[in-house]
């Protein structure tokens, strides 16, 4: 087990996966900045004068971390910043879930038809991403020790898991899926 934890292929996979998640979160926010401003305001955690600067800065910080995770000399710092961001997201979501404000949009991966509401799943997901980011920061990655085959395996695995991650987030946001989930929870309005 220890050899797998310290395996450079696993470390490369984790770095690429976190980078892809951060990029996938940042790019739609940059495209729809006004909408994301509303999402940040809906969390009701920041004083009004900080909402706009935070909403403008966050996607750039996410994108910067995503890029920096691919630069060996910046990888550890970027992973630490990413872990802090994911812990911040977890805290913000948990506070609102605790307040009973689960009707607000997560803001995780923005899209025009987003209906993704927050819940404990989002808290746990953000904590898992924080844990993976801390793993990236803790495990050294020696690129020279990775074969081409291992690097391609890490890349393919990271891309596939990122696509699954985004597809799951997208599917939960579809109105029909949301309705079916509410029926299973016993919250149907029918």
Curated annotation (Swiss-Prot):
Any one of the GO CC terms: plasma membrane
Pfam family, one: MauE
Transmembrane regions listed in the UniProt entry: 8-28, 49-69, 77-97, 126-146, 154-174
Keywords annotated in UniProt: Cell membrane, Membrane, Transmembrane, Transmembrane helix
Swiss-Prot/TrEMBL GO biological process terms: methylamine metabolic process
Protein name: Methylamine utilization protein MauE
Record keyword Membrane present: yes
Pathway(s) where this gene product acts: One-carbon metabolism; methylamine degradation
Record's subcellular location: Cell membrane
Domain of life: Bacteria
Source species taxonomy: Bacteria, Pseudomonadati, Pseudomonadota, Betaproteobacteria, Nitrosomonadales
Function: May be specifically involved in the processing, transport, and/or maturation of the MADH beta-subunit.
Chief location bin: membrane
Membrane topology: Multi-pass membrane protein
């Amino acid at each position: 087990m220890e050899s797998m934890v310290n395996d450079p292929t696993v470390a490369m996979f984790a770095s690429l996966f976190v980078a892809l998640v951060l990029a996938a979160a940042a790019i739609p926010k940059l495209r729809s900045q006004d909408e994301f401003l509303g999402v940040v305001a809906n969390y009701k955690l920041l004083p009004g004068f900080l909402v706009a600067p935070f909403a403008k800065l966050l996607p750039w910080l996410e994108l910067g971390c995503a890029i920096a995770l691919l630069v060996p000399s910046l990888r550890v710092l970027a992973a630490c910043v990413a872990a802090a961001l994911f812990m911040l997201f977890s805290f913000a979501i948990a506070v609102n879930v605790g307040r009973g404000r689960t009707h607000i949009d997560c803001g995780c991966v923005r899209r025009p038809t987003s209906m993704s509401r927050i819940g404990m799943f989002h808290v746990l997901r953000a904590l898992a991403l924080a844990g993976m980011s801390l793993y990236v920061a803790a495990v050294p990655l020696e690129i020279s020790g990775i074969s081409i085959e291992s690097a391609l395996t890490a890349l393919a695995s990271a891309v596939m898991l990122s696509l699954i991650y985004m597809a799951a987030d997208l599917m939960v946001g579809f109105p029909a899926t949301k309705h079916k989930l509410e029926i299973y929870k016993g919250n149907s309005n029918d």
